[in-house]
Amino acid sequence: MKISIVITLGIAAVIAMAVIATIGSGLEQSSQSKIRVAFFPSIGHAVPIVGIENGIFEKGIGEQIQIETKLFDSGPQVIESIFASSIDVAYVGPGPVLNGFLKSHGKDIRILAGAASGGASFIIQPDSGLDSIENFDGKRIASPQISNSQDVSLRYYLASNDLKPVEKGGTVFVLNISNPDIYTLFAKGDIDGAWVPEPWATMLVQDLDGVRLFNEEKLWPNEEFASVLLIVRTDYLENNHELVQNWLKSHKETVAWINSNPDQSKSIFESFLKKHMGKSLPTKIIDESFSNLTITSDPIKNSVLTFAERADSLGYLGRTGYNLDGIFYQPDLNLNTMVKQLIG
């Protein structure tokens, strides 16, 4: 298996460019001899990176199965690729997953497992005054793409403290910009804070003297929430049930391997960046970033449902309510029942 990526970026952007790493054509319809996998070149997506790089997935699904990898920096882009049938399985945050499930009327996406919990933080400028909620008026706070997981969490946090973004008649400027641009604006002092995933959160702290006001898990019950999920396109699942089961098994094996071999996992991640992205990150950033998340196959269902409630309260899930029945894959569901669900 070979992964080829062409990229010319500085270190701040190297792990978030929406590049495509492809073996063969990504526009082809997938088959039982191929699986097309989407993930981000970031620490929260350590499972696909480590599992593919060290051969766990290749061994688990069979060497005769071709693995195509496609790298993104935006969850909504991944969901659109699911809709276009150019992706079979993907690692992505709960925000885009929920939107995609509802947009397809519950037909196109199933959550197979979790991949990471935590790994997002609210980072502020040391002189911003954002350590007190009373000082948020007029501040400029950034998060990645609108409706993505960090964006929902930031806006919900504001609402929980009786604050609104400017576009909703409030006093806080919420900027939805890419992680590399967040890094640049934070360096220039043009934003006061940012709600970002790892390793960007740690980069803002270690590179730019940002202050980690809190890790997002502090705002969740039991201090845990699903930040990365493994999802599958439902028609691919229907046509490749055994292959998907083998991928899921390999996914869980990779989670266990990472947790048993943290130092080796960090080295594999670092080598992945060097080999496929051209540059890596300082070891101290990788170490701290890994310490701020939990690699797990548990989708933490309650957190996904709570996330939906929060997104709905912000108006992200439509005006007529929402129904998440069937969003979680049930391995004991027989194929005939699954087909009936898919065709309505």
Regions found by a protein language model. Name each.
Residues 58-65, 218-221, 291-299:
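Short, solvent-exposed loop/beta-turn-alpha elements that line the ligand-binding surface or hinge
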Residues 44, 53, 74, 78, ...:
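Stable alpha-helical elements in mature extracytoplasmic
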Residues 238-318:
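Secondary-structure end/capping motifs
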Residues 105, 128, 167-171, 175, ...:
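Pocket-lining segment of extracytoplasmic ligand-binding domains
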Residues 309-344:
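Conserved C-terminal helix/tail region of periplasmic/extracytoplasmic solute-binding proteins
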Residues 31-176, 192-198, 213:
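Short, glycine-/small- and polar/acidic-enriched structural segments
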Residues 1-34, 339-344:
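Short, low-complexity disordered leader/linker segments with a strong preference
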